[in-house]
Amino acid sequence: IDMVVECNKDGYLMEHDGCKLSCLMKKGTFCAEECQRMKGKDGYCYAWLACYCYNMPDWVKTWSRATNRCGK
């Protein structure tokens, strides 16, 4: 059985607490590796603060201002 995975979602990866995945003080390839681990195409450390990923599957939870629960 073949399985097709849609990968068209971009966004910030989230920690379990609802906060963006921090990349402060991490190695340069940290975000790209984390994004690829989540089946995304690529990613980078936005402003040295949080991991932003490209072309992730729709099932990956990403941070959203509307549903933000970080620090709450």
UniProtKB/Swiss-Prot annotation:
The record, for Gene3D superfamilies, names: Knottin, scorpion toxin-like
The LCN-type CS-alpha/beta domain extends over 9-71
Tell me the Gene Ontology biological-process terms attached to this UniProt entry: defense response
Q: Which cysteines are joined by disulfide bonds?
A: 19-70, 23-45, 31-51, 35-53
User: According to its record, what are the GO cellular component terms?
Assistant: extracellular region
**What InterPro entries does UniProt report for this protein, alphabetically?**
LCN-type_CS_alpha_beta_dom, Scorpion_toxin-like, Scorpion_toxin-like_sf, Scorpion_toxinL, Scorpion_toxinL/defensin
Give start-end of the signal peptide.
1-7
Q: In which tissues is it expressed?
A: Expressed by the venom gland.
Q: Which Pfam families match?
A: Toxin_3 (PF00537)
- Write out the GO MF terms: sodium channel inhibitor activity; toxin activity
Q: Where in the cell is it found?
A: Secreted
Concerning SMART domains, the annotation shows:
Knot1
The text the record gives for the protein's domains is: Has the structural arrangement of an alpha-helix connected to antiparallel beta-sheets by disulfide bonds (CS-alpha/beta).
Entry's family note: Belongs to the long (4 C-C) scorpion toxin superfamily. Sodium channel inhibitor family. Beta subfamily.
Instruction: From the Swiss-Prot or TrEMBL record, give the protein name.
Output: Putative beta-neurotoxin
Q: What is the lineage of its organism?
A: Eukaryota, Metazoa, Ecdysozoa, Arthropoda, Chelicerata
